[in-house]
Amino acid sequence: MPASVEEVVPLGERNDLQLALVRRPTKSIGDVILQPDSPHLIEGVIIEGVTHHPDDRGYFAELFRVGASKLTAGLAQCPTLQVSVAASYPGTIKALHYHFEQTDYWVPIQGMFQVVLCDLRINSNMHGAVNTIYLGLLRPWRLKIPPGVGHGYKVVGQDLAMLTYLTDRFYNPQDEGRLPYDHAFLNYDWELQHK
């Protein structure tokens, strides 16, 4: 049953992609994704493992092999590929960004991240779903985030965290929307989860 107007914040429409944030009545972290093939993973999000090759000198890891896997399929012919890195201090929250056109490809290279994903796509079967994915040094995964999926993170632990990411187009501020970390409709619990 579609959400009522009072339960939705419209975020815009472009290229047949309509986005809206659905009110979440209970503060939570949504579905925690523990396996790349989880049935709760938001549709269109892809997770792949990163293999580290350690030896006595350190380790080597391939971050992306463009066009060689499901995660990077189609990027080999991309004329506007951009590679960036973000470094964040412990406890930093970079709240939700979303795009109408841009696809993000993330791989952590240092530290640990609590990644938050929210399906903002009105026509998605998972509209309103929220995922939490812990990734980084202790869970080396690559992540593909399609247009219409809000994404953000919190750095967990005591170390600086670094994220390398590809985008399938150059940064365009007109393609990006943002939601504050404490948005009442998102109702995400950023606090440590004591169990």
Model-derived features: positions:
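Non-catalytic, conserved peripheral segments adjacent to functional cores
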Residues: 2-138, 158-195
